[in-house]
Amino acid sequence: MSKVVNLVRPVVESIIDEHGDMLVNMEYIKEKSQNYLRIYVDREPNGIDIDEIAVLSELISEKLDTLDPDPLPDPYVLELSSPGAERPIKTKADWEKALNDYIHVGLYQKIEDKKMYEGTLKSYNDDEIILEVKDKTRRKTLTVPRKLIANIRFAIEF
């Protein structure tokens, strides 16, 4: 399935870039008996609106329909959306944006008897991240080795 993404990514990315938006993620997956090409798009600094998503969807759909040979020979559904407030942190730009933001971290193994933390990302490097987390009534700093991170995403603080 990722072969399709590799084939269409340059086309999709050029259309998105022309509009001043950024490609966050793209996936081609099969759910039940239906194929989906899902494209997640964002715009700095305030996010992308539904009207811009509709414009991009139309342009991308038209362009994909003209490609020869067709990288998507089977019927599929094209879905464009914003990545959402709690999107995964994947790219260098995501990491920069997450700095001093509230995030969720899921771990492969426990640190201090917990496999999940939410807190403010204070710093990061290739080996570890530093989180400021709530511990009952006080805040503390937690160092998390990156190799222990199963998933990491933006989070909404309540």
From Swiss-Prot:
Pfam family, one: DUF150_C
Gene3D superfamilies per record: Ribosome maturation factor RimP, C-terminal domain, RimP-like superfamily, N-terminal
Compartment list: Cytoplasm
GO-annotated biological processes: ribosomal small subunit assembly; translation
Keywords linked to the UniProt accession: Cytoplasm, Ribosome biogenesis
A GO cellular component annotation in the UniProt record: cytosol
Record family assignment: Belongs to the RimP family.
Its biological purpose: Required for maturation of 30S ribosomal subunits.
Protein source organism: Lactobacillus acidophilus (strain ATCC 700396 / NCK56 / N2 / NCFM)
Disulfide linkage: none
Name this protein carries in UniProt: Ribosome maturation factor RimP
